[in-house]
Amino acid sequence: DRSSAASDVYKRQTLDILREMKYYQNAWTNQYDIWFSIYSTPSESLTDRFCRLDKERFGEIPDITDKGYYQNSFHYDVRKDVTPFEKLDFEKDYPYYASGGFIHYCEYPKLNHNIKALEAVWDYSYDKVGYLGTNIPIDHCYKCDYDGDFETTENGYKCPNCGNSDPKTVDVVKRTCGYLGNPVQRPVIEGRQKEICARVKHMKEPRS
């Protein structure tokens, strides 16, 4: 369910789970005198693997196993058409329990024309989150000199201007986990590619 009410319910449930995990983290730290922590993992393979295993066991469940991937960490559903502010408001309560590491990010179109929009998000996030990534398209085609956002499919990437998809003459950069990667030169696992395909921008393209 992708409704706002359902999101609130699931958020409360997942925060309850994290509080329980935090309790054991602290207990084990005191018991063994070794620091334990909760890491909001961007595990590349588990995005794909856990979904496949659950589909084999439980079948195809709408909005869960039918997507072909699981959402990383505490990130808001990448399919949701929300603003950067709404996304950060949803995620901001989770890092308190994730002392081992976390990241927030928002997806944008090219914003060369509107730097103040980015600054507004950064200002808003300043006292709400501890680590914020800004995903702006910087893909480049060396065949037609296009700069921007390549078309993303489950089979790869191509220049929207000339259709070029030759790995030797394109440069594509995507946030594949907590890091930036080039999925043309180093293809990602199938579930991750499906997740990238499902992403929506959290800010709209300007009207021409």
What residues fall within each predicted segment?
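Single conserved hydrophobic/aromatic residue that forms the stacking wall/gate
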Residues: 1-6, 10-13
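Well-ordered, non-membrane alpha-helical segments in soluble/globular domains
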Residues: 11-24, 115-124
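Catalytic alpha/beta core of large soluble enzyme barrels
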Residues: 36, 42-151, 173
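Long, highly charged low-complexity segments enriched in Glu/Asp and Lys/Arg with interspersed Ser/Thr
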Residues: 130-131, 137, 189-208
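Short functional micro-motifs and their immediate structural scaffolds
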Residues: 149-150, 166-168
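Cysteine-rich micro-motifs
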Residues: 153-164
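Short acidic, low-complexity intrinsically disordered linear motifs used
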Residues: 168-183
